[in-house]
């Protein structure tokens, strides 16, 4: 179906076509109606056309008015919009999306990523500076406190100083004994574990019976054997300590 046939029969197409023709020939955009720059050139063109030629008949007058309208709507391709009394803007830059500037989506993502990176770095640097400043303040405070303590000379007698040093020495000796016992305990446990692994590897069955079974807790062991220092080869009798309790085998 041709467009002419459709235009002759369809009311909706007729309405759309009439509205389009009306918009192209008559309708002037609102921003051009309010623009004094457009009005100035519009009036100047009208005066020039009236001064240059005078229509002799009604047909010539209609043709002249039609040509004037066509000239006024198509001559100014760069529409200048007045922002204020001084600044003006070319509407061609924003006519595709009024109120917004057309941008590239990828460029927006790049700009947003750059902005996020810059803000992250700025915040990171600020946190680092604040932390260093706080540490510096604490060091200054501690140094000032130490200087105050050094300036204060406590009035203690020689006997009191000797008592304090004696208590410090006793505490250090007690701590040393505890650490020595703990070290000895872990050494024995390590030797115990190593010897047990060796004996299990040597006397494992592996499909046959061992001719000499393992005698855990045996007393008759040569003195030159390392097993003498191990707990499971010692006599099972446990000693009683000074408090009346059984002593740990370790």
From Swiss-Prot:
Residues 29-70 are annotated as: Disordered. One of its GO terms (biological process) is telomere maintenance. The modification Phosphoserine is found at residues 157, 211. It comes from the Eukaryota. Keywords: Nucleus, Phosphoprotein, Transcription, Transcription regulation. One of its GO terms (cellular component) is nucleus. It is found in: Nucleus. Residues 52-70 have a biased composition (Low complexity). Probably involved in transcription regulation via its interaction with the INO80 complex, a chromatin-remodeling complex. Component of the chromatin-remodeling INO80 complex, at least composed of ARP4, ARP5, ARP8, RVB1, RVB2, TAF14, NHP10, IES1, IES3, IES4, IES6, ACT1, IES2, IES5 and INO80. Present with 2300 molecules/cell in log phase SD medium. This is Ino eighty subunit 3. It comes from Saccharomyces cerevisiae (strain ATCC 204508 / S288c) (Baker's yeast). The gene is IES3.
